[in-house]
């Protein structure tokens, strides 16, 4: 019986630690949402997690986290796609995640779509948990 209680306690503490890893609030009021555990969208190879920085209802910036995508292709995503979200209102950023074609990312279709899904998941998470 004690063993079951200890296991339950460990599981609960792991879940609460997980929630803190997803969204944090910086001293300046910026929320940082990490999609490592909340979005399973895959690029060409594996997941393409991002950090979405949000302040006062605007996306400040999107930062690509460590992934295993092909470097030359993912570089296009970082160079052309991620800056499109800088300083956008959340509603406009959400609409942009739903676009099927994004200029400038030719050849990086899988990565682009996966990153868009990650950004969408981050915005949704922020809106539900802020």
What kind of region is each of these model predictions?
Residues 10-18:
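Hydrophobic h-region of N-terminal signal peptides that target proteins for export
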Residues 1-4:
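Positively charged n-region of N-terminal signal peptides that target proteins for export
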Residues 18-130:
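Flexible, solvent-exposed loop/hinge segments and secondary-structure transition points
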